[in-house]
């Protein structure tokens, strides 16, 4: 029986504390919980607004996690989800001390995803990236585009393989959404076509097409819902006020348990990728949306990870046009003409793909096979 240690950081979901209570293992240092019979150690980390304190907290988490790892026994494999790269580094050191294997999972390509492309810091990050790739026992990445980008950075490409992300179909499925439990102040019952985005409101998304699309369809029975937080939220809110876009609703994060209902409330889920970052990331929410039977409206360039993934499955309207005016026009025309039956077909196609290829059981088995092959 292999023992696996998974090293990552998480946000606390208050609704989960009742079913997975945390108790202090070492007071002030780490907590312990049980997840379906699996012992989990948690290193609490405060979120500071001050940059220096955030860096200090980041370093503290790495040191404490490394020390905790040293005291774990009978570890066969350490799985390191990324980012950040530094998790991969300390886990390689830990694996050498413990005499175990390491798997590094590439979810985003660092430092490629960063806006700066040169300088001393970027050069050091590139060296760190290659160190992690070449000193891990195995490296997994989520799709062929990512594989093609990073394969040349390996001395031994045979250790790199593709294992996609998955969705928990027990929580997210086309039968799981009850819109009656939603707050009617945030989610009113209307006959309008509802487009929705839930997640980080940051730089990875391109918000200009959304504002232009909302302005172009103003007065039409179409509404746009944006749920989340992030650095671009104040910018969006200011634009909505400036242009008097009553058809755009910007809402705070909602409880995770409500997400199936929120997805059911929407007619279409939209994702508009930032052209500067669209090659380095794949929004995992795509799987969740498909599992819940919702069609997608996606703006991204040709041959990007999200376009390459979706174009084979018939579950999304894909916009690859570069011109802002043309892409907004194409989206507006589609929204004004698409029927409910066409949207339902796109949604059903997505559900079938998830069940066949991207369920929790299917993807987990791929990791089991990888671990046993090490």
Label the model's feature ranges.
Residues 221-228, 234-260:
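Nucleotide-activated donor-binding/catalytic signature segment of Leloir-type glycosyltransferases, i.e.
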Residues 1-6:
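Short, small-residue-biased leader/transition segments that mark boundaries at the very start
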Residues 116, 151, 167-185, 191, ...:
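Acidic anion/phosphate-binding donor-loop and adjacent secondary structure
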Residues 187-205, 210-214, 225:
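Conserved donor-binding/catalytic core segment of Leloir-type glycosyltransferases
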Residues 70, 86-89, 93-97, 120-141:
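Membrane-proximal helix-turn-helix segments that form the acceptor-binding/catalytic region
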Residues 145, 163-166:
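Carbohydrate-associated surface elements
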Residues 341-357:
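A short, well-ordered alpha-helix in the C-terminal region of glycosyltransferases
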Residues 205, 255-262, 269-290, 295-308:
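Nucleotide-sugar-dependent
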């Amino acid at each position: 029986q292999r023992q696996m240690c998974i090293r990552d950081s998480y946000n606390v979901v208050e609704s989960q504390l009742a079913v997975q209570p945390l108790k202090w293992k070492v007071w002030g240092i780490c907590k312990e919980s049980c997840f379906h019979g699996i012992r989990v150690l948690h290193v609490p980390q405060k979120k500071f607004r001050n940059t220096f304190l955030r860096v200090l907290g980041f370093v503290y988490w790495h040191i404490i996690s490394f020390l905790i790892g040293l005291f774990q026994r009978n570890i066969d494999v350490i799985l390191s989800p990324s980012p950040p790269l530094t998790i991969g580094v300390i886990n390689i050191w830990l694996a050498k001390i413990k005499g175990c294997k390491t798997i590094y999972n590439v979810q985003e390509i660092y430092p490629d995803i960063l806006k700066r492309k040169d300088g001393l810091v970027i050069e050091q990050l590139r060296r760190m990236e290659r160190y992690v790739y070449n000193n891990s026992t195995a490296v997994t990445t989520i799709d062929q585009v990512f594989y093609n980008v990073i394969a040349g950075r390996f001395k031994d490409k045979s250790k790199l393989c593709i294992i996609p992300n998955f969705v928990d179909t027990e929580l997210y499925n086309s039968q799981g959404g009850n819109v009656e439990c939603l707050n009617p102040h945030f989610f009113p019952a209307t006959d309008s076509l509802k487009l929705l985005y839930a997640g980080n409101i940051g730089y990875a998304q391109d918000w200009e097409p959304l504002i232009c699309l909302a302005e172009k369809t103003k007065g039409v029975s179409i509404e746009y819902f944006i749920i989340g937080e992030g650095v671009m939220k104040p910018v969006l809110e200011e634009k909505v006020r400036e242009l008097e876009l009553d058809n755009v609703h910007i809402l705070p994060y909602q409880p995770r348990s409500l997400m199936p209902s929120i997805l059911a409330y929407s007619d279409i889920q939209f994702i508009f990728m930032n052209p500067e970052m669209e090659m380095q990331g794949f929004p995992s929410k795509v799987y969740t949306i498909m599992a819940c039977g919702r069609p997608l409206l996606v703006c991204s360039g040709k041959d990007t990870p999200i376009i390459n993934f979706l174009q084979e499955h018939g579950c999304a309207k894909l916009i690859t046009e570069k011109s802002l005016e043309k892409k907004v026009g194409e989206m507006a025309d589609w929204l004004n003409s698409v029927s409910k039956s066409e949207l339902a077909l796109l949604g059903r196609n997505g559900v079938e793909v998830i069940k066949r290829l991207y369920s929790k059981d299917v993807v987990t088995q791929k990791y089991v096979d990888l671990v046993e092959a090490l």
